[in-house]
Every structure is written in structure tokens, then in C-alpha cells.
Design a protein with these regions (language model features):
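Acetyl-CoA-dependent GNAT
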Residues: 2, 6-77, 88-90, 94, ...
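Non-catalytic, surface-exposed connector residues within folded enzymatic/regulatory domains
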Residues: 26, 81-82, 136
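Conserved glycine-rich acetyl-CoA-binding loop
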Residues: 52, 71, 75-89, 96-98, ...
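Short, conserved glycine- and acidic-residue-centered signature motifs
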Residues: 62, 84, 135
Length: 150
């Protein structure tokens, strides 16, 4: 079991390192501060027993009843150990408690592991996004209710 907590100002360097090891695309580390201004409670960090961040999820509010996962990363050595599921469940619980009913995200079509993870966790693929990424890669939009039993 991993500790899930809110993002803290001092987390930026660790989360940026996780992002560099998780994503194919470069982005500016200031995005963490930006997302925090968009929806403070939608920024969660998973820590190991020593308190070191090993994963994170960053979301924003996009409509009156919908939230969007913008970034979701877990260190490679911590994947398939339940970190991602704990983060996603905590994110959905936060969204539900604030009255949101659905969550969306985008993922590369080539990222089959992530797509399987989301499908196992109640998401469905809703759109193919041709040339969605800067390098021309295609994406898939996925959506799910915030409550797992819906």
C-alpha cells in the first residue's frame, strides 16, 4: 500500500523526474504549478514507505461536471504494483465528492499498457485523435464515470 497525498510545493523536482521517465514528450515543469491553480484537489502524489514520490496524477476541471486527467505517471520500477490504481481511485473519489460525474483523458494509441489499465478501470475509448501529439503520434480519448459502479 502506498500513501496518497496532496501535491506539495517541494514535490516539483521529483514529479518532473517521474514525468521524464514516464512520457515521450517534453513539457515545462511549471505545468505542475499551473494545474494546481486549475484544481488544487486534483493533484495527487503517491509515496513509498520512505515518503519518496513514486507516482502522481494531475487533473483539471473542464466542465461543470467533468474532470480531465492531464498527466499521470508512475516510476517504471513501481508499475504493476497497485500505485496507479490507488492514484486513479483517489482521484475519482475526490472528483465524486466535489460533484463531478465523469473523467476524460487522452493517451497515445501506441501505449497499449496504459490503454489496458484504463479499460480495466472502467474507461472506454470514445475518439481516435489523429496526429494528436507534437511528434505526429495518434491519440485515443477515453472516458469513464467517476463512480466505478456506474
Amino acid at each position: 500500500m502506498f500513501q496518497i497525498r496532496d501535491f506539495r510545493e517541494g514535490d516539483t523536482d521529483a514529479l518532473y523526474d517521474i514525468a521524464l521517465r514516464s512520457f515521450d514528450e517534453y513539457f515545462d515543469p511549471s505545468v505542475f504549478a499551473y494545474f494546481r491553480t486549475q484544481w488544487r484537489t486534483g493533484q495527487l502524489v503517491a509515496c513509498d514507505v520512505t515518503g519518496r514520490p513514486v507516482g502522481f496524477i494531475a487533473g483539471t476541471r473542464i466542465e461543470s461536471r467533468k474532470v480531465r486527467i492531464m498527466l499521470f505517471g508512475v516510476l517504471p520500477e513501481y508499475r504493476n504494483k497497485g500505485v496507479g490504481k490507488q492514484l486513479l481511485d483517489a482521484f475519482r473519489m475526490r472528483a465524486m465528492m466535489e460533484g463531478y460525474i465523469s473523467v476524460i483523458l487522452e493517451v497515445r494509441t501506441s501505449n497499449t499498457d496504459a490503454r489496458r489499465f484504463y479499460l480495466r478501470n472502467g474507461f472506454r475509448e470514445t475518439d481516435i485523435l489523429m496526429h494528436y501529439y507534437r511528434d505526429g503520434g495518434d491519440g485515443v480519448r477515453m472516458a469513464a464515470p467517476v463512480q466505478m459502479n456506474q
